[in-house]
């Protein structure tokens, strides 16, 4: 049986001194099969040597094939690497398979484009990521972001939510309200500048009142735009001093979360809270206890993780703790990312995919639908995203489909002017 070697050649990306070699390779069709195979192999070897291409380190890009519920496109060389991934036991419609698209509008403003694994432009990015197993689009929103934080604007989020809705993909949406003018993290929970000013004025408005007013106004704008999300996440890593009044024995911040969750529930929106991982997984019961005392009506408890060698075992322990103290809540990983490129050359799309699969599996069992939201998934050019600096999708994204048992039935490799068949 003839074996096919597919080499993807992107126009304008090869060194000029390979131009003649490429032209000769494209003219091979005039020769007989045996001669063509021998000559092509020799030429391909020369091409690899002069361009630095390597089948060992670079995924080969194959022509896109049609997708369906149980068929996804995977570049030919990636098939063997992905064969080991089975459908995760317990995964289902309620599992959150999320991609953070906060940077999406910013990337469009920068002139970036989104392509499939074969460098072909996709008609609809949301239809495309759904075909790769994603079921939730997540967006972070700041109160009054400016400068380098402008990408966090509500206006950008509404544009993206409208695009998701127009795609008719039935993707779920999650909006993370940061209650700050910038990204918030564990030790960085800066109050919006206007709220801080209002609190200091003679007729002071408390930060809690400002937060509730902001929530009402945001929901009103979303409803007016007809893009009310399925889920709203209240803050980010809120166990670390939400609104600056939650740390230690602070109580008002927790109570504010309860009031905000009540506002959201009236609108029929599911609630999530995002926490920073505690050193001891058992400590989550104290967070759940405080949420209960403050009457926070939430559906999901998300934990942000910064992966290390113990992350998966930690998440399994955390899942057991949540199932014990809050059995009606769904634990998810609300923020995570893995390198696919690094300076040490120890990361690639396959290590990235493997890390995602193992973490996702750790969140799921018969009691917890689990899931994760992949941070900055749509940030074109990031070493941790699903799109490289040219906008090409990375095969690691398909791990979400494999985790659901959506396997490619048959590879259909076609020849066009940008491909060489050996």
Where are these regions (language model features)?
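Sec-dependent signal peptide cleavage junction
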Residues: 48-68
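Aromatic-lined substrate-binding rim segments of carbohydrate-active enzymes
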Residues: 121-184, 249-270, 315, 319
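Hydrophobic faces of well-ordered beta-strands that scaffold small-molecule active sites
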Residues: 97-101, 137-139, 173-177, 232-234, ...
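N-terminal carbohydrate-binding accessory modules
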Residues: 68-132
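Active-site beta-loop-alpha junctions enriched in small/polar residues
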Residues: 102-104, 142-144, 176-180, 234-239, ...
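Aromatic-rich peripheral "rim/lid" segments of glycoside hydrolase catalytic domains that contact
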Residues: 343-355, 362, 366-422
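Bacterial Sec-dependent N-terminal signal peptides
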Residues: 2-42
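Active-site cleft segment of glycoside hydrolase catalytic domains centered on the general acid/base Glu
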Residues: 154-155, 185-291, 296-298, 309-320, ...
């Amino acid at each position: 049986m003839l074996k096919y070697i597919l080499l993807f050649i992107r126009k304008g990306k090869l060194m000029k001194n390979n131009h003649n070699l490429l032209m000769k390779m494209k003219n091979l069709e005039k020769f007989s099969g045996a001669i063509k195979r021998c000559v092509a192999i020799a030429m391909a070897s020369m091409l690899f040597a002069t361009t630095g291409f390597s089948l060992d380190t670079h995924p080969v890009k194959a022509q896109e094939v049609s997708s369906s519920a149980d068929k996804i496109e995977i570049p030919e060389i990636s098939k063997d690497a992905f064969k080991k991934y089975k459908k995760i036991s317990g995964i289902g419609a309620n599992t959150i398979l999320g991609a953070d698209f906060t940077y999406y509008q910013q990337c469009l403003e920068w002139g970036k484009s989104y392509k499939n694994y074969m460098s072909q432009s996709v008609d609809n990015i949301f239809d495309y990521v759904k075909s790769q197993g994603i079921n939730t689009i997540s967006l972070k929103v700041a109160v009054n972001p400016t400068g380098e934080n402008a990408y966090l604007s509500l206006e950008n989020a509404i544009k993206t939510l409208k695009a998701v809705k127009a795609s008719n993909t039935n993707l779920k949406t999650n909006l993370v309200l940061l209650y700050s003018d910038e990204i918030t993290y564990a030790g960085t929970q800066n109050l919006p500048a206007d709220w801080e000013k209002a609190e200091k004025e003679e007729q002071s408005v408390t930060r809690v009142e400002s937060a509730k007013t902001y929530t009402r106004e945001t929901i009103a704008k979303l409803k007016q735009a007809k893009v009310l999300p399925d889920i709203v996440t209240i803050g980010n890593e809120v166990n670390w001093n939400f609104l600056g009044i939650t740390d230690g024995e602070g109580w008002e911040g927790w109570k504010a979360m309860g009031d905000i969750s009540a506002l959201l529930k009236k609108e029929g929106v599911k609630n999530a809270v995002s926490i920073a991982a505690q050193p001891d997984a058992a400590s989550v019961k104290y967070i759940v206890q405080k949420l209960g005392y403050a009457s926070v009506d939430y559906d999901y408890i998300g934990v942000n993780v910064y992966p290390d060698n113990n992350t998966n075992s930690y998440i399994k322990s955390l899942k057991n703790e949540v199932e014990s103290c809050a059995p009606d809540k769904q634990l998810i990983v609300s923020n995570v990312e893995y390198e696919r490129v690094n300076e040490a050359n120890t990361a690639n799309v396959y290590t990235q995919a493997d890390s995602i699969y193992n973490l996702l599996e750790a969140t799921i069992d018969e009691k917890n639908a689990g899931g994760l939201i992949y941070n900055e998934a749509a940030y074109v050019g990031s070493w941790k995203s699903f799109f490289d600096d040219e906008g090409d999708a990375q095969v690691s994204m398909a791990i979400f489909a494999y985790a659901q048992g959506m396997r490619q039935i048959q590879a259909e490799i076609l020849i066009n002017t940008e491909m060489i068949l050996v």
